[in-house]
Amino acid sequence: MANPITSVKVSQTLPPAPNTLQRTGAFISQGATTTAQDTLTLITQLSDLTTILTAPQAVSSITWSSGTATVTTTLPHGYPVGSGTINLTLAGFTPIGYNGTFACTITTTTEFTFALAVDPGAVTVEGTVIAADVARLNYDVTNFFAQGAGNSVYILELGVGTTADGVTTLTAFLTANPGTIYAFLVPPTWDSEAAFLTLIASYESITAKLYFFVTTTTATYSRYTALMKDVMWMVNAPTAPATEPSSIVGMFWQWIYNQPSSSNPLAPMNCRYVYGLTPWTGLGNNTILTEIYAADGNYIGSGAEGGISNAIIRGGFTADSQQANYWYAIDWVQINLDLDISNAVINGSNNQAAPLLYNQAGINTLQSVAVSTMQNAQTYGLSLGNVVTTQLSATAFAASYNAGQFVGQTDVNADPFLSYSTENPTHYKIGQYNGISVIFTPQLGFEQIVINVNATEVV
């Protein structure tokens, strides 16, 4: 229209899309799938795994001599030559003494050897060979989906190799793809791998937001120390079958199933139900279960003490003795404060009616966003205590904190514009504001309850 009386300027304020990192988990595969190395494949149901599992390879001959079996495959097997021992599973042979899972040395592109003390005899029926990790991965993913609906998971293929090869490949993947996966369920064979402990040490910081779910044993769990906030470990029950290589898969499922909200607050990890997994029995095991619990480990127990027949997670700890919810809450607060404040800054630069500027009003806006985030944390079962706001200088805030003023509360402090600019005279020029501080206590659950009972004859 020519010569309009009114012009309308339009800006758009967009809400942040939820950050889904804490719902992202992955199983480690070492040659169990047909996908390329460093490939992440999303699995939404068990049948998705079936289509990518490696098929057995035909063996053309197997011979025995002086305690060593030599296997020749019909086609090149694809296992790395000279990289150390690799666990392979042989099946379908007659005599059956050649069947089983063995630590194999790859000698050529079509041959490998393994130690076999007794000569099974001449082969009359040739069988097949497959990476041992295929069965393990299939069982773990089967048990994962047995926990319930509503969860998907990734498979990260690291390629066939030794446990050390797998750790090296995962280390490189994590360096190249930070913040991609929140939790990994690692193969039980990694429990004895020294390089894995080095990898764990790289993600022990309070900001790491990465967790490893580990299957260990009563003889080796002491490897996992109080520094390892990024590890949750579990010892399988002695009666767990071969189809249950990693009982901790139930805890892994629960960890990435969390999606806290006002209608679904975060529940404690301890005593959550698991399905299809083998619980420890108290008969003859009380001492070791007490030791596992005292060492901040986890195990599958029974709900019988509460009159419930379901198997449950006992412990719910990270290796540094914290309840799992402690670190989940800290991660959630980091992720969502970043998300919500960044969203406010971006929207503020695209709002012509009320742009976000570096002044007291702008600081007030950012503080209100942080307050809203922490109010959600409280409502979602992540933070203990009511949310309060303060606008104190750095010195005054430190004094109040040291005096215990914020005990039992969640405080969101914003250093006022004038005092902050005086304390940090170069920051205004470069647009940097470091004046928002949040103090909160992660919401935890009960672990043990003591009831005092006094029986009296006084009437």
What does each of the following model-derived ranges do?
Residues T41-T44, T169-P355, L366-V369, T373, ...:
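A glycine- and small-residue-enriched flexible loop/hinge signal that marks low-structured segments
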Residues F102, Y182, I436:
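Residue-level detector of short, conserved catalytic/binding motifs and their immediate flanks
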Residues M1-P56, A131-R223:
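Small-residue-rich
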Residues S11, I28-Q30, T44, S65, ...:
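A structural detector for beta-sheet-dominated domains
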Residues M1-T54, G316-V459:
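Structured, hydrophobic secondary-structure cores that serve as assembly/anchoring elements
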Residues A26-S29, G127-T128, V249-W255:
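Glycine-centered structural positions embedded in regular secondary structure
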